[in-house]
């Protein structure tokens, strides 16, 4: 009886576009990227992403391109839909993770979005707000610290397109990227 009830809940979730059982959250991506607090390095190695919920990686391992390694995959994002994750790093440790968000990000609602995507107890602190002359596009920078993990910086972006399309991304790095300007 319990399995029938669980199946009905999952089917209702699929039908109404709610939570997916095998979907990752931004918190899952951040936990895979950020090293444990006691670790001497800021980020984890590549294997931390091998078990990301629902991820379908392109290839079995990262591929070298120039002086960096790259690994891209499709991943269902809890409560949002199908997104993509792009990882960049050295041979052993990661430098960054970028999540291509499948929906438009409402910049005014970023705090609520992050709170819904990270586990309770995560410290989320806005370190840069709106840019001057921000109308259709913009970004925000947050510092996120999950319990027992090193901090990460999140660059939350929404870019409108003159053809009606838009791009929404969340970049994660262990240090604030100087390229994240207005």
Region locations from a protein language model:
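Bacterial N-terminal signal peptides that target proteins for export
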Residues: 1-8
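Sec/Tat signal peptide C-region and signal peptidase I cleavage site
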Residues: 17-23
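N-terminal secretory signal peptides
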Residues: 25-87
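Broad, structure-driven detector of short, well-ordered beta-strand segments within folded domains
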Residues: 78-89, 150-160
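Long, charged/polar, surface-exposed segments that mediate recognition or autoinhibition
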Residues: 80-139
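Mature extracytoplasmic/lumenal regions of exported proteins
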Residues: 136-143, 148
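Short, exposed beta-strand-loop hairpins at the edges of beta-sheets
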Residues: 156-171
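Short, low-complexity, Pro/Ser/Thr/Gly-rich segments in the mature regions of secreted, periplasmic
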Residues: 167-182
């Amino acid at each position: 009886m319990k399995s029938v009830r669980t199946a009905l809940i999952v089917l209702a979730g699929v039908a109404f576009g709610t939570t997916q059982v095998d979907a990752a959250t931004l918190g899952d991506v951040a936990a895979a990227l950020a090293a444990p607090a006691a670790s001497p390095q800021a980020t984890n190695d590549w294997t931390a992403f091998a078990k990301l919920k629902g991820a379908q990686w392109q290839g079995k391992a990262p591929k070298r391109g120039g002086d960096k390694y790259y690994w891209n995959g499709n991943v269902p994002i809890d409560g949002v839909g199908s997104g993509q994750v792009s990882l960049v790093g050295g041979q052993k440790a990661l430098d960054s993770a970028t999540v291509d968000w499948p929906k438009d990000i409402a910049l005014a609602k970023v705090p609520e979005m992050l709170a819904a995507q990270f586990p309770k107890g995560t410290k989320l602190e806005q370190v840069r707000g709106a840019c001057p002359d921000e109308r259709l596009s913009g970004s925000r920078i947050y510092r996120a610290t999950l319990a027992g993990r090193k901090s990460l910086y999140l660059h939350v972006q929404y870019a409108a397109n003159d053809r009606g399309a838009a791009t929404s991304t969340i970049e994660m790095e262990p240090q604030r990227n100087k390229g994240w300007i207005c």
